[in-house]
Amino acid sequence: MRFDKLTTKFQQALADAQSLAARNDHPYIEPVHVLAALLGDPDSGAASLLARAGVAVNRVQPAIDSALKGLPQVQGEDNVQVGRELQSVLVRTDKEAARRGDTYIASELFLLALADDKGDAGRILREAGLQKKALEAAIDAVRGGENVSGAEGESNREALSKYTLDLTERARQGKLDPVIGRDDEIRRTIQILQRRTKNNPVLIGEPGVGKTAIVEGLAQRIVNDEVPETLRGKRVLSLDLAALLAGAKFRGEFEERLKAVLKELAQDDGQNIVFIDELHTMVGAGKAEGAMDAGNMLKPALARGELHCIGATTLDEYRKYIEKDAALERRFQKVLVGEPDVESTIAILRGLQERYELHHGVEITDPAIVAAAELSHRYITDRFLPDKAIDLIDEAGARIRMEIDSKPEVMDRLDRRIIQLKIEREAVKKETDDASMRRLAVIEEELEKLQREYNDYEEIWKAEKAAVQGTQAIKEEIDRVRAEMAELQRKGQFDKLAELQYGKLPELEARLKAADSAEREAGESDSGKPRLLRTQVGAEEIAEVVSRATGIPVAKMMQGERDKLLRMEDFLHKRVVGQDEAVRLVSDAIRRSRAGLADPSRPYGSFLFLGPTGVGKTELTRALADFLFDSEEHMIRIDMSEFMEKHSVARLIGAPPGYVGYEEGGYLTEAVRRKPYSVILLDEVEKAHPDVFNVLLQVLDDGRLTDGQGRTVDFRNTVIVMTSNLGSQHIQSMAGKPYEVIKEVVWDELKHTFRPEFLNRIDEVVVFHGLEAQHIESIARIQLKRLGERLEKQEMRLDVSDAALAEIARSGFDPVFGARPLKRAVQQQIENPVAKLILEGVFGPRDVVPVDWQDGKFVFTRTLQ
């Protein structure tokens, strides 16, 4: 017979049979080798065909293994020949193919030829229940009246089961999530499916709004018989385009597979509805030089009504791919899927609640569901409901489950800190200097304290974990172990029996005892001990997830934070001196926003700081960032003098399409996208081009800005501070006059520089006073304190006398330049001499660096600490 007339699958089976014979040192390939190869290939379909013919396939494999062991072996024989018995079976296979009119010989005909085989392979199949007539009927059913006319004829058989997923079957098994709401969209989809022509709906909507869920909802309705008569009993099949493309190495393979799918769909008389998720991927899929893509192959079937199809894609991709192909677009009817509102999202989450509770093994409360919908809508602006709300519920549930299964976060942090200190201890032990010895003592003390704390937590955690897991699961486990012990005893496997009897069983019984006592004590509240494990997902857990994802402090304010906000002025005054009015206005704005009273559609606060140079405008902004985020890193500083030209506006929001740098994004918009909760400092704002203020209008009013790529950036969680020197000459000339009078004069000058619509959108215009002599001394203390902190890192202490402090303040005071000359005075009169003395070795570790003013000069006299 001609081996080139075998189908690809059959050729592969013969090659595998040859390898099997060679591995086992068999000199000849026998029918049993080929049978083993066919059953060993999951893609061959031989096992499913035999099962359909009533063969007990699970009995076949052990019998084949036994038959292979009984075959003669020849050591060192490399040339494996086709055995006489196999030749005889192949001849019968060839005759059967000719009788059926097949151009190529398929592997199922080999199985049919084995039905009459007198050898091992035939005997094994007959003993497993093979009957020739049943196998012939199964082959006819699989072929569907088609002949094998190509080498891939076998591969493309049952294409629907290979390349699609049956959603109606999954719905029947209860594997699909319940679909809540979306009745209008499902009804419109059903309406389009019932049309005579162009009965192909395409669901178009933003990512995450529930397009796929609508199709799953349709599948569930079909299963529940909640659809019109024309749709009853139909199947919804999800097309797996990746499976169609995977492994299509040669030209025409992909087209052949898709053609096989379309052919099967054409034969089913419209009983199958194909769902193509990400419909735009069909345009261009499988396209090679001069070949057709999947989109073009679908058009005729769609036009004739042979293919009942539902597509789903996003708005952008529909416009980019489908709309460009007018012939494809006209064959689909659009169903726009909008983003559900917060109320609808809450209803959807309530429907999914039970599924997520089962998956995570925790309880999800109703306040958590409401919080997930509201907080995701408010704070996660770059994604869509209900997807982003479901994500919050899912992640909060996963977090609680993880705490139950593994160490609680507080213990994990302690554990890592203990390891870190142990590593440091080993490194410091090798050093012999005094500083290392002192550090070693500190490490030992801290390690002992942390270890005690960890042990206390571990004791609480173990008790709580035992209570949470409950007794039922442990009882079931004990029951299972005892059943396993009885089985092992019957088999005489006493080593494994001993492991269970003296190892696992006592451990489980101890756990059961602990769980029982923990459950009894669960009702008794122990206020002295912190609770480590949570079993409920509440609103606070959702807020924690949002806070971690966005960096925005959404979580309920703890008492410590409330006190901190109430004393905000004291914190800011530690760094900003002499600007009481400015500090009060800024503090009030932050308190309003954190108390939830500020307008949610605008930034937390927008301020215009006015005043002479060096009075603390930028320093107050830095102090504000430090107060809100415990770090000045969260301050986005933009020097507006860099935006003096008209075209420089594009640098803020990103270049428009077609310009160089389009993909890079804007300087301001990208910074806020990465840190949505931050203080934005627009320094020297009056130096910017007037067009820059047009961009800022929508930021100040609506709290959002559209960048060069059309993405909306959320500024609602930012504090915007603009600084300017405008009116500084009036502020200095009117020193000592009431604040309101100075502000009125400065306001008149502002009107000449900035447009009314810009000024009208700013929350507060804050006028900074010029600094006076008494303020400079307080600022000098702050500057010297920072110098002292730098010296402390070198184990030295700075001690400045009152006389020296007064002299520094006097020499550093300049009413025109504010506090900046003071910084230079500290640098020149203190830092420079001290730096020289340290380098000369006069001052070293554990020394006090005294600074005094004597006889018209600064004096530094060394004393031991």
Curated annotation (Swiss-Prot):
Protein name: Chaperone protein ClpB
Free-text domain note: The Clp repeat (R) domain probably functions as a substrate-discriminating domain, recruiting aggregated proteins to the ClpB hexamer and/or stabilizing bound proteins. The NBD2 domain is responsible for oligomerization, whereas the NBD1 domain stabilizes the hexamer probably in an ATP-dependent manner. The movement of the coiled-coil domain is essential for ClpB ability to rescue proteins from an aggregated state, probably by pulling apart large aggregated proteins, which are bound between the coiled-coils motifs of adjacent ClpB subunits in the functional hexamer.
Pfam families per record: AAA, AAA_2, AAA_lid_9, Clp_N, ClpB_D2-small
Region (Repeat 1): 6-71
Keywords: ATP-binding, Chaperone, Coiled coil, Cytoplasm, Nucleotide-binding, Repeat, Stress response
Highest taxon of the lineage: Bacteria
Statement: the UniProt record of this protein carries the keyword ATP-binding: yes
Positions of the UniProt region annotated as NBD2: 561-770
Region span, Linker: 340-551
UniProt lineage: Bacteria, Pseudomonadati, Pseudomonadota, Betaproteobacteria, Burkholderiales
Region of interest (C-terminal), residue spans: 771-865
UniProt feature coiled coil, ranges: 390-524
Residue ranges, annotated region (NBD1): 158-339
Record field: transmembrane: none
Stored CDD domains: AAA, RecA-like_ClpB_Hsp104-like
Residues reported to bind ATP 1: 205-212
Localization in the cell: Cytoplasm
Organism: Bordetella parapertussis (strain 12822 / ATCC BAA-587 / NCTC 13253)
Protein role: Part of a stress-induced multi-chaperone system, it is involved in the recovery of the cell from heat-induced damage, in cooperation with DnaK, DnaJ and GrpE. Acts before DnaK, in the processing of protein aggregates. Protein binding stimulates the ATPase activity; ATP hydrolysis unfolds the denatured protein aggregates, which probably helps expose new hydrophobic binding sites on the surface of ClpB-bound aggregates, contributing to the solubilization and refolding of denatured protein aggregates by DnaK.
GO biological process: cellular response to heat; protein refolding
Positions of the Clp R domain: 3-145
GO cellular component: cytoplasm
GO molecular function, one term: ATP binding
Oligomeric form and interacting partners: Homohexamer. The oligomerization is ATP-dependent.
Region described as Repeat 2: spans on this chain: 82-145
Protein family membership: Belongs to the ClpA/ClpB family.
Residues reported in the UniProt entry to bind ATP 2: 611-618
